[in-house]
């Protein structure tokens, strides 16, 4: 539930996740915690008052990322107290060609934009070629979006190459026949 942080011993959590991995739609709060409780594992929680967002579905993950683009997002990465301590690769800053178009995006270091990006979160080391259009999407690190590709409301994994003139997410919304509860919502992954 919102505002509660759960702490687990690694081995206990690993065993629970392995046991429940085959269960369709396995959810932490609905399945893992009750499973550990039934097994007699010690369960502890603490009242957490900071930012928290359930990103247990692709739609929720997409929404949380899109919220980062808001003028003043609830989870404001630019607040002085939100220091990010991490080891990062030494790569050049972003590059935007004279012909590129950028509107309301977060763009990682080393990214080169020759096309058009709007309302998107773009990871580090991404290349968006001339004529490519990315809208309302999450593009993870080291991905190449080739010339003329159109990507809309999609989550693209890292180190992927989207081919020339490919179209992802540019369609009428349709129910996913394989896992409708997991993948419905107009997202392409």
Residue ranges and their predicted role:
Residues 1-2, 189:
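General structural signal for secondary-structure boundaries
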Residues 11, 19-189:
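Left-handed beta-helix
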Residues 14:
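Nucleotide phosphate-binding site architecture
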């Amino acid at each position: 539930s919102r505002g509660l942080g759960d702490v687990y011993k690694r081995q206990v959590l690993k065993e629970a996740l392995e046991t429940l991995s085959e269960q369709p739609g396995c959810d932490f709060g609905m399945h893992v915690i009750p499973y550990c409780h039934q097994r007699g594992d010690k369960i502890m929680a603490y009242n957490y008052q900071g930012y928290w967002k359930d990103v247990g579905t692709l739609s929720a993950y997409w929404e949380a990322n899109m919220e980062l683009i808001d003028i003043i997002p609830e989870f404001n990465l630019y607040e002085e107290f939100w220091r990010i301590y991490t080891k990062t690769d030494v790569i050049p800053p972003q590059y935007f060609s004279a012909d590129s178009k950028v509107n309301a995006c977060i763009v990682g270091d080393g990214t080169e934009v020759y096309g058009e990006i709007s309302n998107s979160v773009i990871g580090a080391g991404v290349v968006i070629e001339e004529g490519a259009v990315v809208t309302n999407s999450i593009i993870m690190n080291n991905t190449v979006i080739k010339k003329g590709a159109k990507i809309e409301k999609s989550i693209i994994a890292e180190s992927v190459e989207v081919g020339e003139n490919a179209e992802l997410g540019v369609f009428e919304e349709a129910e996913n026949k394989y896992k409708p509860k997991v993948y419905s919502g107009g997202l392409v992954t």
